[in-house]
Structure formats: structure tokens, C-alpha cells
């Protein structure tokens, strides 16, 4: 990714991501990178606006996670501290970059608690998060490097695939739009979703969704929910289109953004529903 098209915040977020992954080295097999940094692995081609994110999101697979060493202790030793907000799974670096540790909601027994109890690890180590279920199956190892020339580190970690990221972004946007916390709705998530659909063949994402759902029935509820919500966003004015237009404001005409969201999402959904492949 060209250095001139990367924001300073993203450079710092990648540096802190590598710090966290190094601290959690013994647990790397149970970690999957999700969120914007995963999106940019698959969709490095952007626009005149610098690639931007301020944090790092990691999904934990409880089936693969070892009980030792303690994640909280490892992060603390590396200079991270629990977020003062008290949000479970939110860890803050010395320079204020947040690393979120999340366990897919469907990978744990049902509970009303946000905390994700993990044997051998503190109660606030991670939190349950809906929408990440597919990332435990749709991922591949990627060698991540720093975005600064003087930092020569490389850490190989599993990165969620485009299908998993589309579902995660859709569920995140839906929950924030329909929830009581409208202040947490950001246009960037819709922009990231559109970026994925533009950089990765939309039909191939749809086929991957269908195949993953068939191979791993446990993800069917969340995939179905995301697909149904996306389908309902493609006619008339909708929160998804409004957010995507807002994200591209000043860069791209609203009509062009609207057409791109509708056409690319429809192509993905049609491929997903094409039983004959």
C-alpha cells in the first residue's frame, strides 16, 4: 500500500496491532484479524482519501485458545491496559490505540452477559460479539508488516476473508442503526463494505457465503440475518445507502455511490442464492 495513501492513524494502528500480536504469540493459532485492518488486506485499492482506521479488532476462537499464558497478563506486560470505559475486551496501548478482543457470539453458550468467559483468562479479557461467527471458518494466514520503513517486523496471523467481513460489517451496521445507540453509527463501516465489494469480485463473495454456510451450518443464522438485512437496503432510501453516500461525500457523486451499493450487493446476493452455482 503506497505510504502516501495511508493515514498516520492507520500507521499507528498497525504498529499497535503488531505489538498486540507479538504479546499474544502463544495464542496466534486462536486469533483471527477482523475489522478495518482485515478489510484493507483484501481491498488495498482505495481512493484519494487516505486509508484510515484507529484501532485493531481480533476475534478469538475459544475452541483453539490455550488456557496459558494469561492474555490479560501478556497484554499488561506489553504496555496495554483495560479501557477506562470498562468495556470488556477493550485494551488500550500506551499511545491510546484500542485493541478489541472479541469472541463470536455463536461460538459460546448463550448468556445475557457481554463478557466472554475463557478458561484460564480474566473475566474482562474479551467480549461476545455477534457477526464474527463466519471469521472462524473463512480466514487464511497473512504475513502482516509494519507501515513504517524503520519497523521491520512481520507477524503471520489468520485474516478473515471477504465473505466473513461482509457479514460482520452488515451485522454491525444493522445493530447500530436499529439499536438505541445511534451515536455509535458511523458511515465508515458502510464505506468499508463498499470498498470490499469493489475490490473483491462480488459474485465470488456470494459463492463463498453459500459454500461456507453449507459446510458450517452453525453460521447459518447470522449469515441469513445479514443477507436478509442487506436485501432490504437496496430499494429506495435506506440507512446503508445513506451511510455509504456520507462516507464518500466530497469524493464521489451520491448517485454513483447509490448505484454501486445496489448493483454490487445485488450481484453478491444473487450469487449466494444461485443453488446451481
Question: Where do the model's predicted regions map?
Answer:
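Compositionally biased terminal segments of proteins
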Residues: 1-277
Amino acid at each position: 500500500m503506497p505510504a502516501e495513501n495511508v493515514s498516520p492513524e492507520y500507521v499507528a494502528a498497525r504498529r499497535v496491532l503488531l505489538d498486540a500480536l507479538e504479546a499474544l504469540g502463544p495464542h496466534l493459532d486462536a486469533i483471527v484479524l477482523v475489522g478495518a485492518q482485515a478489510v484493507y488486506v483484501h481491498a488495498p485499492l482505495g481512493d484519494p482519501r487516505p486509508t484510515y482506521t484507529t484501532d485493531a479488532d481480533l476475534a478469538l476462537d475459544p475452541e483453539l485458545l490455550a488456557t496459558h499464558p494469561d492474555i490479560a497478563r501478556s497484554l499488561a506486560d506489553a504496555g496495554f491496559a483495560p479501557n477506562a470505559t470498562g468495556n470488556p475486551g477493550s485494551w488500550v496501548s500506551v499511545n491510546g490505540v484500542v485493541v478489541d478482543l472479541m469472541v463470536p457470539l455463536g461460538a459460546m453458550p448463550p448468556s445475557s452477559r457481554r463478557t466472554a468467559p475463557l478458561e484460564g483468562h480474566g473475566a474482562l479479557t474479551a467480549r461476545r460479539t455477534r457477526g464474527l461467527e463466519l471469521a472462524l471458518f473463512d480466514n487464511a494466514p497473512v504475513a502482516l508488516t509494519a507501515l513504517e520503513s524503520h519497523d521491520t517486523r512481520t507477524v503471520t496471523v489468520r485474516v478473515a476473508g471477504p465473505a466473513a467481513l461482509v457479514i460482520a460489517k452488515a451485522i454491525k451496521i444493522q445493530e447500530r442503526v436499529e439499536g438505541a445507540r445511534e451515536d455509535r453509527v458511523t458511515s465508515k463501516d458502510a464505506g468499508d463494505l463498499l470498498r470490499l465489494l469493489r475490490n473483491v469480485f462480488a459474485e465470488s463473495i456470494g459463492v463463498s457465503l453459500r459454500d461456507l454456510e453449507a459446510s458450517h451450518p452453525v453460521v447459518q443464522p447470522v449469515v441469513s440475518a445479514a443477507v436478509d438485512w442487506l436485501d432490504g437496503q437496496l430499494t429506495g432510501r435506506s440507512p446503508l445507502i445513506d451511510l455509504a453516500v456520507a462516507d464518500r461525500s466530497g469524493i464521489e457523486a451520491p448517485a454513483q455511490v447509490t448505484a454501486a451499493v445496489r448493483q454490487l450487493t445485488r450481484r453478491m446476493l444473487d450469487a449466494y442464492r444461485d443453488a446451481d452455482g
